[in-house]
């Protein structure tokens, strides 16, 4: 199973891997993450300068590290994700969350200046 990239407005923000035995493929995970991030991006563009990038959060749910966008789960960081990025799950989630924030803010700035 090949890794699957997830973009926010054309900016790649994370790369998901297969979630393990009998779980979702990388592409299935990427599709779910993309849908949540599209909704967050539309919300951010509507909010413009008042958008709070702190809506993108890293949290612990049960024994998992997750990334949230406006309270919605973007993705669960799997062992495969962490190993593939030579990182701990928490460090990887922090990095991806920052990528998502930057991607959203860049798209908001572009939309505000008429570049999109």
Region spans (language model):
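N-terminal targeting peptides and non-cytosolic leader segments immediately upstream
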Residues: 1-116
